[in-house]
Regions:
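Generic detector of well-ordered alpha-helical segments enriched in charged/polar residues
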Residues: 165-172, 176, 218, 273, ...
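A short acidic-to-branched-hydrophobic micro-motif
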Residues: 123-188, 249-251, 258-259
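Intrinsically disordered, low-complexity Ser/Thr/Pro-rich tracts
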Residues: 1-132, 173-176, 183-185, 201, ...
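Surface-exposed amphipathic alpha-helical segments
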Residues: 252-313
């Protein structure tokens, strides 16, 4: 109950006491209260005075302070995505990568129109429109293959080519399972389709890029039995974006310190044919034993270029 209400009640009690005392007095010209009435009146007056004093001394109510305003938390600062030293960033359409400066003098790109030759055509004669990136002044001038990166739309390729569909499924299976050991004659998935056969692989390794993953390896394609040499081998990367929207094929000439530039024809060609499988297995093992820096360009540099690749949304 509030103090003002208490004061009012006490004053009312005092008035009632006085009235009660007055009822006991005789009607005379001079009213003289008895001792009980006087004591009651004094008590009521004292309580009223105490209540008034307490009300005066009570501190005035104060409002609770408003909570201090807090500044919104700032988002974390992201590290700037800049090319590594010694590389140059290239962006063509929605494809981006950082090329080591010593790999080539210049980089070009073009949109290759779709080639639709029908279901009976050779697989290499069928492909959707795709982005082709080529290199001028490549570090290895004498090679059978031309350096190129191709970026293909997966859905468009699958719509027109069953061999491409099979290749994407094989590649995806490899990327999901990532076997620890890959046989030299595994016949790894590879695009573009050439009119020749993959005779071996070496230095196979799964490498992720910023928008997906893939497998890189060394290989050589041939239409006949022929020794492995630097002129014919190449480095390739076969990758899929994480959303399976794009396929990336990289074909780059490469040299190994363990191989001749141009192999000589075997002295006994028939014996070479009969032992060709053993020869390829031994060649693959020899290349697998080579350090990454024993190749030109080095496997370390090429892996870093792969890791820098990005499909821009």
């Amino acid at each position: 109950m509030k103090k003002s209400e208490s004061t009012w009640i006490l004053a009312s009690i005092a008035l009632l006491v006085l009235c009660a005392a007055a009822c006991k007095l005789p009607f005379s010209s001079t009213a003289v209260p008895d001792d009980a009435a006087t004591a009651a009146l004094q008590l009521a007056q004292t309580q009223v005075g105490i209540s008034a004093t307490q009300t005066a001394l009570a501190p005035a109510p104060t409002e609770a302070p408003a909570p201090a305003a807090t500044e919104p938390a700032l988002p974390p600062t992201l590290e700037p995505d800049t090319p590594a030293p010694g590389t140059t960033r290239y962006t063509f359409g929605n494809f981006q990568f950082d090329m080591p400066d010593y790999l080539a003098l210049d980089v070009n790109h073009t949109i290759v129109p779709a080639a639709l030759e029908g279901d009976e055509a050779f697989p290499g004669a069928i492909q959707p429109e795709y982005l082709s990136i080529t290199f001028d002044g490549y570090i290895i001038p004498d090679a059978f293959h031309s350096p190129e990166i191709g970026v293909y739309p997966v859905a468009d390729y699958m719509e027109i080519s069953q061999p491409a569909t099979d290749t994407f499924e094989e590649l995806n299976y490899l990327l999901v399972n990532r076997p620890q050991t890959i046989p030299y004659d595994a016949g790894l998935p590879f695009i573009p389709f050439w009119n020749a056969g993959q005779i071996f692989n070496a230095q196979a390794k799964f490498v992720d890029f910023k928008s997906g993953s893939g497998i890189r390896f060394l290989s050589m394609y041939a239409q006949a039995v022929y020794p492995v040499d630097n002129y014919n081998i190449f480095f390739t990367y076969q990758g899929l974006s994480a959303d399976h929207a794009y396929f990336i094929s990289m074909v780059l000439p490469i040299n190994s310190a363990a191989l001749p530039m141009h192999a000589e024809d075997p002295a006994d060609y028939e014996a070479f044919i009969n032992s060709f499988s053993t020869y390829l297995q031994e060649t693959s093992a020899m290349l697998n034993a080579e350090a990454p820096e024993r190749f030109t360009p080095t496997l370390t540099v090429l892996d870093a270029m792969i890791a820098s690749m990005r499909i821009i949304p």
